[in-house]
UniProtKB/Swiss-Prot annotation:
UniProt-listed Enzyme Commission number(s): 2.1.2.10
Family according to the record: Belongs to the GcvT family.
Identification of the protein by name: Aminomethyltransferase
Complex and partners: The glycine cleavage system is composed of four proteins: P, T, L and H.
Pfam families attached to this UniProt entry: GCV_T, GCV_T_C
Task of the protein: The glycine cleavage system catalyzes the degradation of glycine.
EC top class, as a word: transferase
Domain of life: Bacteria
InterPro entries in alphabetical order: GCS_T, GCS_T_bac, GCST_C, GCV_T_N, GcvT/YgfZ/DmdA, GcvT/YgfZ_C, TrmE/GcvT_dom1
Keyword Transferase belongs to the record: yes
Keyword line: Aminotransferase, Transferase
Length: 376
């Protein structure tokens, strides 16, 4: 997920925008869009997802369909993850890399399979603020004589329903049985009698689904889920939920100048099982010599919240910076993500964070800060 603000004059609206207005959502600008930041309150929405179910309008995110022969082998050159391992109906969270190994964006690649002519199909979801950048980058590195690329971002609604009871709320509106779908699994589905796409993915650390449908179906599905008792949630709860789960926010925790090895995303880098890809030589070097800095989890003392941009200190000297921070609604204490030198990244390492001109004690803790016992 990405972080970017724009002026009110340029803000786009999703097909579900009016539903947010009807529910008196508080709105904000995000990635070029006017989006709900909260409906009934961030804490209530956060707790609904952790304990039952909440739903999010994520239609602002970029959505691409691709098809062509040798599609997967071409995409292999853009990401460090081994996409050849994907079976039809499986997805891979990964990153687009620049030649310096920096992260252009974090994305999900959904492999839909290969037909009897050898044509492969895939669906990619990218961050809202980076949709144009990602589209240009992908197109510039694919053989467009072999691959058909379509940006379907404006044409589709994307709804996320998240939480331990998400499947029970969603199932009545879907013809197919959702239970067999594993994490990062997906399928073509019939939603409210119409064609749709459902994936068992999310950005909250809980079990849940993301549903791609036509706008009119999306409006009907949102109303149906709301009438069934699902709590509408905004970007505020989405941020506290993802931060508790230590999921990176593009533009804050990761960007063009951070590599996946620095950002704790080494599990996405499959150097031993795939060939060349953009940025590979940099990651090989980092793997061999070690990274100079690492993204860590921090817990600050009391209720002092380390916010984005705050300085991290060791022995009174600035050694790094906070990328994201909040008071965890689930845990009841402040948590943060920050970059520090690798030698200071060990769990238990005492540090300090400068908050409003004063240094407060902090300690490096394991990530994620919260791990659900309800994941599907």
């Amino acid at each position: 997920m990405a972080n970017q603000k724009d002026t009110a004059e340029t803000l786009a609206r999703t097909p579900l925008y009016q539903l947010g207005v009807e529910l008196k959502a508080r709105l904000t600008s995000f990635g070029g869009w006017e989006m709900p930041v909260q409906f009934s309150g961030i804490t209530r929405e956060h707790e609904a997802v952790r304990n039952a179910a909440g739903m999010f309008d994520i239609s602002h995110m970029g959505k691409f369909t691709l098809q062509g022969k040798n599609l997967i082998s071409q995409l292999q050159g853009l990401v460090p993850s081994d996409l050849s391992r994907l079976q039809p109906g499986q997805a891979q969270y990964t990153v687009l890399l620049n030649p310096q190994g920096g992260i252009i964006d974090d994305i999900i690649v959904y492999y839909q399979g290969e037909d009897n002519t050898g044509t492969q199909q895939a669906f990619i979801i990218v961050n809202a603020a980076t949709t144009s950048k990602d589209k240009a980058w992908i197109l510039s590195h694919l053989d467009q004589n072999q691959v058909q690329f379509q940006d379907i971002s404006p044409a589709k609604v994307l709804i996320a329903i998240q939480g331990p009871k998400a499947i029970g709320y969603l199932q009545p509106f879907v013809q197919q049985n959702l239970q067999p779908i594993k994490a990062f699994g997906h399928l073509e589905a019939t939603v409210l009698g119409q064609a749709g796409f459902i994936a068992r993915t999310g950005y909250t650390g809980e079990d849940g689904f993301e549903i791609l449908v036509d706008p009119e179906v999306g409006v009907e599905l949102w109303r149906s889920l709301y009438d069934a008792g699902v709590i509408p949630c905004g970007l505020g709860a989405r941020d506290t939920l993802r931060l508790e789960a230590a999921m990176a926010l593009y533009g804050q925790d990761i960007d063009d100048n951070t590599t996946p090895l620095e950002a704790g995303l080494g599990w996405l880098v499959h150097l031993d099982t795939k060939g060349d890809f953009i940025g590979r030589s940099v990651l090989e070097q980092q793997k061999a010599t070690g990274v100079q800095r690492r993204l860590i989890g921090l817990q600050t003392q009391g209720r002092n919240i380390a916010r984005h941009g705050y300085q991290v200190l060791s022995d009174g000297k600035v050694v790094g910076g906070v990328t994201s921070g909040t008071l965890s609604p689930t845990l009841g204490y402040p948590v943060a993500l920050a970059y520090v030198p690798s030698k200071l990244a060990k769990v238990g390492q005492p540090l300090e964070v400068e908050i409003r001109g004063k240094a407060y004690p902090a300690v490096v803790v394991k990530r994620p800060f919260y791990r659900s016992s309800n994941k599907g």
